[in-house]
Curated annotation (Swiss-Prot):
Stretches for region Disordered: 37-68
Gene name of this polypeptide: rpsU
Pfam families recorded: Ribosomal_S21
Keyword Transcription regulation included in the entry's annotation: no
This protein's name: Small ribosomal subunit protein bS21
Xref: PANTHER family: MITOCHONDRIAL 28S RIBOSOMAL PROTEIN S21, SMALL RIBOSOMAL SUBUNIT PROTEIN BS21M
Biased composition (Basic and acidic residues): 37-49
Amino acid sequence: MQIMVRDNNVDQALRALKKKLQREGVYREMKLRRHYEKPSEKRAREKAAAVRRARKMERKRMERDGIK
């Protein structure tokens, strides 16, 4: 990954770098890899996230259709 520093403005270049890293998901991956996660824990975490997403989508659909 490469960021150009223009007019010796390091602060702006750092902000651009952080934004790129955030968009690429590097921070999220670093957080996940900080400690070892057992495969069973990973499956449980991913399943819980899927359930949350499904509930959220269902709520959005119900709200959109006017059913409450």
